[in-house]
Amino acid sequence: MKIARFMFGLEETWGVILGDSIHAISGIPYDIKNVGNRICSLSEVTLLAPLTLTNKVPAIAANYGEKDDRDGPGIFMKQPGTYAPHQGNIVYPRSCKSVIHEAEVGVVISKTARHISESDAMDYVMGYTCVNDVSAKETIESDLGKGLSMRWKHFDTFCPIGPHIETEIDDPGHLKIECFVNGELSAGGNTSEMIFGIPKLISWVSEVMTLQPGDIIPTGCPETAEINIGDVVEVRIEGIGSLVNNVIEDY
């Protein structure tokens, strides 16, 4: 099932995508009892990022590459001002000289989770979505001497998410991840290459903070590459979908 948040006219709501149409649902999307009778064509709606401004995005750092002896991965937050929808813009900050894309699988939480064991973790998953954890590359070197920099990950529009939540993924531990820039393959990998798997990530984050329905955990990026003003960036994840954004000049 593909669950999307969308705007129809002046109304913002959630719905289920069926073919070329979207069927509005009432209430919250995390516990769908039935699909409503109100149907819109996808061409008539604007897709929004599939979360609200009250939802958290605790993102995972350094989860690909050589395995090491860490107990768990690093965690950082993407603040609500970074959220951007499918077909929305990534604003290239005027103060930055190097910006990179990071294509990631986002795990969407279905119910309140705190101190969750790895063995129970998948019971708290609603589905999966595409995330682009955009980062200001040069701040990694220029700011990190002062502590983990807010500038690295937190410029406005630096977290496109979407286009929808896919609830039916048989094996999220083996998903192909690709990122295209202007139609050319720029980076790729597979979730099988993660150092820490999804159950570990959910458990690890739930020891730090209480996860709520709709929170999204980006699981890390296998490869990155630079993006520039005028680029069209596409995150494509097997079984989930395609998240497309335009890179525009700061305003």
PLM ranges: what are they?
Residues L48-A49, I90-V99, A113-D120, S149-W152, ...:
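A generic local secondary-structure boundary/capping motif
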Residues M1-P73, E168, P172, E178, ...:
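N-terminal non-catalytic cap/leader segment that marks the start of a structured domain
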Residues N63, E102, G106-I109, H115-N132:
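RNA pseudouridine synthases
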Residues R5, A24, V57-I60, V105-I109, ...:
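Short hydrophobic-aromatic micro-motifs
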Residues T52, I100-E102, Q212, N228-I229:
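Residue-level recognition of short, solvent-exposed, well-ordered loop/turn junctions
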Residues A49, K56, K97-V99, S203, ...:
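Residue "hotspots" at secondary-structure boundaries inside conserved domains
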